[in-house]
Swiss-Prot record:
InterPro entries: YcgL-like_sf, YcgL_dom
UniProt xrefs under SUPFAM superfamilies: YcgL-like (SSF160191)
Residue stretches making up the YcgL domain: 12-96
Pfam families: YcgL (PF05166)
Gene behind this protein: ycgL
Protein's name according to its UniProt entry: Protein YcgL
Lineage: Bacteria, Pseudomonadati, Pseudomonadota, Gammaproteobacteria, Enterobacterales
Superkingdom of the source species: Bacteria
Species for this entry: Escherichia coli O139:H28 (strain E24377A / ETEC)
Transmembrane segments annotated in the record for this chain: none
Length: 108
């Protein structure tokens, strides 16, 4: 029981689900198995949610593939956060860019 005058803070958790239809796509919600605030169309495209983990957000400074402040804000305001996969690396474009820079450097 908290001491008088001390407010017990509510910890912020999120529950993360993996998409059954889209690789590297995750849905963060506030409560386990509560998708009531997630739009129906999003759920259709997401497929059957597969529980990945339950994660405390308090005291955490960062997440691996998402901005923690954006996640917290989205959970508070809309009740969910959708993490999409990072764009694929275009290795050919990177290589051509580097080669173009080398060509420019040798022509000077």
């Amino acid at each position: 029981m908290p001491k008088p005058g001390i407010l017990k803070s509510k910890s912020m958790f999120c529950v993360i689900y993996r998409s059954s239809k889209r690789d590297q796509t995750y849905l963060y919600v506030e409560k386990k198995d509560d998708f009531s605030r997630v739009p129906e169309e999003l759920m259709k495209g997401f497929g059957q949610p597969q529980l990945a983990m339950i994660l405390p957000l308090d005291g955490r400074k960062k997440l691996v593939n998402a901005d923690i402040e954006k996640v917290k804000l989205a959970l508070t305001e809309q009740g969910y956060y959708l993490q999409l996969p990072p764009p694929p690396e275009d290795l050919l474009k990177q290589h051509l860019s580097v080669m173009g820079q080398k060509t420019d450097d040798t022509n000077k």
